[in-house]
Amino acid sequence: MKNGVKQLFLLSLIGLSLTNVAWAEVARPKNDTLTNTIQSAELKTSSFSSMPKKEIPNRHIISLSKSQLAHHPRLVLRGLIPALYQNNTQAVQLLLPLYKQFPQQDNFLLTWAKAIEAREQGDLTQSIAYYRELFARDASLLPLRYQLAQALFFNYENEAAKIQFEKLRTEVDDEKFLGVIDQYLLTLNQRNQWIWQVGLNFLNDDNLNNAPKSGTKIGSWTAWEKESGQGVGYSLSVEKKWPWADHFFSKTMFNGNGKYYWDNKKYNEATVRIGGGLGYQTASVEVSLFPFQEKRWYAGGSSGTNTMKQYADKLGIRLENVDWLSKTWQISTALEYGESRYKIRKHLDGNYYFVSSTLFYLPKSTQFWFVGMDFHRENTQALDNAYQQKTLRLGWGQDWFYGISSRLTFSYANRVYREKDLIGIQQKNREYTTTITLWHRNIHFMGLTPKLSWDYQKSTSNHAFYRYDKNRIYLEIGKIF
């Protein structure tokens, strides 16, 4: 298909005038519910390419009827390729039946045409499936990404559509087209729908309690032994926005996550956070402030039981800001303050401060980089449990050929405790984490995409009991809808 793609604009320079075809029209679904703020725009091929436009003399233009075209496969192909790129529904519907009759067909072009046809017929689910199949084969085609984003938008898959439009925005230079994308993003932000995100990963941890090397001793003190466990990790996030006038909104959110080990239930845990507040948003900026309440249940660890019990409560407030500095740079910042109260371990009662900032760079729609810094201060009644931690995070994501995608993240944290513990050591830890995740963009099960991850953690410390390293491989699946 790549050779055919490279020939696209060369072929499209050969004039072809078809009966009842309007080349510049942007196709929209029959049941189009797009708000009036988004107008039908002429998105010419030059919107997606730096190829120079050429004026085509009238003497090079020929006019053929549909029956005459059926005898000219090369002309049909020359018309179909730019029709696909220009999102021209009428031309695709005219040429696709003719193209299907020819003995030699390009499967990529055929699937693309079917995606446009399915969208026009109102079968958005099938259209999206076709687009995802194409994306798995080549994620670099910007017209393809735009059409996928459109289909997701009209199918009310809001978060997925937003991701595609934001990626597309990084590679578009045409101001008119950027304005269209911003209108889509603004409309997505104003939709007052529930947003759901679910996740599941299979756990296989051979060092649940982060134990040091077996037999580690400090004087007469002996470190705890490793415990292992297999199970599942789960998460659920739900959010709803209610738009107000002048870009303001109110928001309700719920976040829940936990771990269930079927062969070591003493380490089962679950956390739930509920919050709501106010915010302000445009196509490129979103700021929100909301109080929250959090509850945690825990079975107790090595000294616990097989039943989870209420472990701790938190009450706090969080400020979040996301700002597109340019079409390729984004900064995300969060500030959080909370009060912690424990049911049994009262010496851990106190408050905490958390500040996080992440800078994203998206040089193109198939790649992103980020660098982030976090500061966390935990104040507890027992000062040997109080600490402050500084973290540096780095990451790189890439969509490769043949449908493969990858994500690599690295973090380094420096944690220093305020006072000496019972053994007489003021703990100072350096914590390293590396995670590599791989998945195939065209592999889905009931709408869920499986991802394979390898995770390595290492802790070095002046306290021998807190030196350990471990690695694990696990499968995770998730979906946003």
Swiss-Prot record:
Which N-terminal residues, if any, form the signal peptide?
1-24
Membrane-spanning parts: 194-204, 223-243, 248-257, 271-281, 285-295, 315-325, 329-339, 353-363, 368-377, 390-399, 404-414, 432-441, 448-458, 471-481
Main localization, broad class: membrane
Keyword Transferase listed: no
Cellular compartment(s):
Cell outer membrane
Which function does this protein serve?
A: Required for correct export to the cell surface of some cell outer membrane lipoproteins.
Q: What is the lineage of its organism?
A: Bacteria, Pseudomonadati, Pseudomonadota, Gammaproteobacteria, Pasteurellales
Per the record, the domain of life is: Bacteria
Q: Which family does it belong to?
A: Belongs to the Slam family.
Topology within the bilayer: Multi-pass membrane protein
**Which species is the source of this protein?**
Haemophilus influenzae (strain ATCC 51907 / DSM 11121 / KW20 / Rd)
Key word Lipid metabolism present in the record?
A: no
What Pfam families does the entry give? Answer: SlipAM, TPR_Slam
The molecule here is called: Surface lipoprotein assembly modifier 2
Alphabetically sorted, this entry's keywords are: Cell outer membrane, Membrane, Signal, Transmembrane, Transmembrane beta strand
Residues covered by region (C-terminal probable beta barrel): 193-481
One annotated Gene Ontology cellular component of this protein: cell outer membrane
Q: What is known of its domains?
A: Consists of a soluble N-terminal domain and C-terminal probable beta-barrel in the outer membrane with 14 predicted beta-strands.
